[in-house]
Amino acid sequence: ANKKKSQPAEVEVQAKSYQKQLNEEIAKDRELHEKKPLKNKDNDDDQTPTPPATKRISQSKTDPECGLFHKGEHEKQFAYVANTACDRHNFILDFVLGAGNIHDSIMFSGLFEKVLKKFPEMQATAVDAGYKTPAIMKQIIESGRVPCVPYKRPMTKDGFFKKYDFVYDEYFDCVLCPNNQPLAYSTTNRDGYREYKSNAKICKDCPMRSQCTESKACQKIVNRHIWEPYMELAEDYRHTPEYRDIYKLRSETIERVFADAKEKHAMRY
């Protein structure tokens, strides 16, 4: 569809497949830390049902079901995306189609369940960095399979400490900063992240503050997902030669599938 023939549209935000389970675990985590339960957005005092959350998108006039796909920083096009799974011999096992504005990680769950049902003998799953999320790592590991993932570059500013510079202390449930000062637990938010906050009085005179935070309150906040242990386990697998070699097979398997689709079946735009 022509990307110039579009119109603004208000659409309902689709709930994530794991949202119910995440909400339950957030409630348990808050109770464990003696925090009040989060208010349910659907329960108001006047008992009036809350309308579903919506978002504003650019919708194609020609094909309203497709989505605006962003390729890189400047290129975009109305399109569909195909999330595809194949085996080590390059045979396609299954796929799911979705609008171009749906992130790959959202579509993964349905595809993984379909492949798992057809091929229960599967032992490992190689995915790229776009699928490296706590929910996906949890789903793969709890199914008894091994996730084979790549290194993912820290999303922090140049010159600032990376997330791995802040070490989590499981025994005391706190985070230690590069200056060996503790960041105490503060709360667990709706997205499933525990927030750890530093002592502003200590940070104010810290010699490393310019590399740590630009906060006017002189306070560093580090987020840690309640499913972070699954991410850490995936990192352990990443350093294992057996699973590192499995990930390297992507270049000659699924990448070949995409190359054939683009070159031989006119799927390149």
Describe the residue ranges of each PLM region.
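Anion-binding and metal-coordination hotspots
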Residues: 1-269
